[in-house]
Amino acid sequence: MANFTAADVKELRDRLGAGMMDSKNALVEADGDIEKAIEILRLKGQKGNAKRGDRSTAEGLVAASTQDGAATLIELACETDFVAKNDKFIALSESVLAAVVAAGASTVEEALQAPAGEQTVDQLISDQAAILGEKIALRRVARLAGEHQEVYLHRTSKDLPPQVGVVVDYSGTDAETARSIAQHIAFANPEYLAREDVPADKVEAERAIVTEISRNEGKPEAALPKIIEGRLTGFFKQVALLEQDYAKDNKQSVKKVVEAAGLTVTGFARFKVGA
């Protein structure tokens, strides 16, 4: 005769989100000891997670929060869009984000060790991965803590949670323009804030490429410097936020838009699921 009750099964399911039969079997194996049953389920979950270790996690969601003068952005990855839109996965992302924010974590390593109730974020993710049957990973974390922050989350499909997330750090008072800049970043995907932030070796590599292209096109040698600089300007427009044409008015650069609004963008982070 089983030495546990339906209430024990319910408690185990509520605490771990495990299935009915998994909970019953764990309680049988644990002789009715709930804490031991939890350890049994977690151990089985860890073994399952190990088997899933090499699987690709190209789906998931981004989530963000602004609190106490800082903005935090995370990407939580899974294997399929079916799990990405699952209520348990979305609830997990909310719990992970709350724990990361509370800990002030700014890296994945710090975030995984952040307390999440009676366990760490790493353990919380591991438990839910076992329940959902997919590899789940906290892929990226960013934390910005300047004067002001603005957040923008974008859905690429109405059936899925946000797939693109942006946080912007800025000084100034025009929050509406700051949010518009966050939307621009989501659309234009700059890699750097200003042209001065682009690594010198990357600039020189691009210079070598456009020089070779220009010469192969038979451009006059005397005209090459001007042509090369023009093409480098196009390169900076691709990779540097302030050099880009503003998405809502391509007759203006982002730099001119923020200057006109009295803003100074001091940093940003952009995550796209799977990218």
UniProtKB/Swiss-Prot annotation:
Gene3D superfamilies: 1.10.286.20, DNA helicase RuvA subunit, C-terminal domain (1.10.8.10), Elongation factor Ts, dimerisation domain (3.30.479.20). It comes from the Bacteria. The gene is tsf. It comes from Clavibacter michiganensis subsp. michiganensis (strain NCPPB 382). One of its GO terms (cellular component) is cytoplasm. This is Elongation factor Ts. One of its GO terms (molecular function) is translation elongation factor activity. NCBIfam families: tsf. It is found in: Cytoplasm. HAMAP family: EF_Ts. Keywords: Cytoplasm, Elongation factor, Protein biosynthesis. Belongs to the EF-Ts family. Associates with the EF-Tu.GDP complex and induces the exchange of GDP to GTP. It remains bound to the aminoacyl-tRNA.EF-Tu.GTP complex up to the GTP hydrolysis stage on the ribosome. Residues 80-83 are annotated as: Involved in Mg(2+) ion dislocation from EF-Tu.
